[in-house]
Amino acid sequence: MEDYQAAEETAFVVDEVSNIVKEAIESAIGGNAYQHSKVNQWTTNVVEQTLSQLTKLGKPFKYIVTCVIMQKNGAGLHTASSCFWDSSTDGSCTVRWENKTMYCIVSAFGLSI
């Protein structure tokens, strides 16, 4: 049981990271409609708040967070990522959030130190 708790304390827990990302998106964008002039501010706020909250977890990781905000206008968007890492210690999480006017896609990567 102690080994499980120790592993949990140093693991990249996808559900935990996903919740942090969702909270950051809601806080930064919330119920706003897409405004091109605000996108830079929103993306910066999302990644900085996400990084801040991940760091507060106190886990032995280096983090990488990306954020894409795209207006809903019928255009397609395809993204992919590939990582060469130790899947037993490192992890990633991608959250897709949307409202009536935009999509927000955030990826968070945790690399064990």
UniProtKB/Swiss-Prot annotation:
Region (Interaction with GNB1): 41-113
Post-translational modification: Phosphorylated by BMPR2; the phosphorylation is abolished by BMPR2 mutations in exon 12 which lead to truncated forms of BMPR2 and which are linked to primary pulmonary hypertension (PPH1) [MIM:178600]. The phosphorylation status is proposed to regulate the association with the cytoplasmic dynein complex and may have role in cytoplasmic dynein cargo release.
Main location, first listed in the record: Golgi
Tissue localization of expression: Expressed in heart, placenta, skeletal muscle kidney, pancreas, spleen, prostate, testis, ovary, ileum and colon. Expressed in lung endothelial and smooth muscle cells (at protein level).
UniProt modified residues of type N-acetylmethionine: 1
Coiled coil (residue ranges): none
Cellular component, GO annotation: cytoplasm; cytoplasmic dynein complex; cytoplasmic microtubule; dynein complex; extracellular region; ficolin-1-rich granule lumen; Golgi apparatus; host cell
Family under the similarity heading: Belongs to the dynein light chain Tctex-type family.
Quaternary context: Homodimer. The cytoplasmic dynein 1 complex consists of two catalytic heavy chains (HCs) and a number of non-catalytic subunits presented by intermediate chains (ICs), light intermediate chains (LICs) and light chains (LCs); the composition seems to vary in respect to the IC, LIC and LC composition. The heavy chain homodimer serves as a scaffold for the probable homodimeric assembly of the respective non-catalytic subunits. The ICs and LICs bind directly to the HC dimer and the LCs assemble on the IC dimer. DYNLT1 and DYNLT3 compete for association with dynein IC (DYNC1I1 or DYNC1I2). (Microbial infection) Interacts with human papillomavirus 16 L2 protein; this interaction is essential for virus intracellular transport during entry.
Annotated protein name in UniProt: Dynein light chain Tctex-type 1
Source organism per UniProt: Homo sapiens
